[in-house]
Amino acid sequence: MLRIEIQSRNGVAILHCSGRVVFGVEVEMLRSMATSRTEACVRIDLSRVEKIDATGLGLLVELQTWAWAKRKNLTYLDPSEHVWLLIILTKLYNSLEISYSDVIQFSGEIDDCGRQELIA
């Protein structure tokens, strides 16, 4: 199961993911949620992702390519230890924009209008 909580403020959308990014409805949901965002900056928080498979890693690359083509700024935030290990093993760190500090800068009080949640 994948849970995505969305925060949007000042032209920046953060998709907080928790659970599994694996082949099936989880990958399709993340793809749909990320590519439907109208903000110029999209952040995908991977700190609570417990499992990711080859399809999930492929989606990270696909979304990064999509963002470059659409001239959007896409950054992956705080990959969990499991996700980071696979990024290192597959040498995707050169292909993905990864940050460990943006979550702290963005955190703050969000009103209900800027918060959404989806579960698959």
What positions do the PLM features span?
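STAS-like cytosolic regulatory interaction modules
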Residues: 1-51, 61-120
